[in-house]
Amino acid sequence: MHTLIIVLLIIDCIALVTVVLLQEGKSNGLSGAISGGAEQLFGKQKQRGVDLFLHRLTIILAILFFVLMFCISYLGM
């Protein structure tokens, strides 16, 4: 059981890193903040399509990561 959870955790970590790297950047960094990128801050645009799917998948994979970590720590006791 412990080995199965560790394998699931490794798969989840790889998937989480992949999904985060597939997402587009949402800001221009520090240069956008200095040169007046406030319209991006206050004029929030809705996410659609692939961006929305990747955002939700990131949240699900992150929650799964924490659940698996709690399971591993519980079984390790």
From Swiss-Prot:
GO terms for molecular function: protein-transporting ATPase activity. InterPro entries: SecG. The chain crosses the membrane at residues 2-22, 57-77. Disulfide bonds: none annotated. Involved in protein export. Participates in an early event of protein translocation. Belongs to the SecG family. This is Probable protein-export membrane protein SecG. It comes from Staphylococcus epidermidis (strain ATCC 35984 / DSM 28319 / BCRC 17069 / CCUG 31568 / BM 3577 / RP62A). The lineage of its organism: Bacteria, Bacillati, Bacillota, Bacilli, Bacillales.
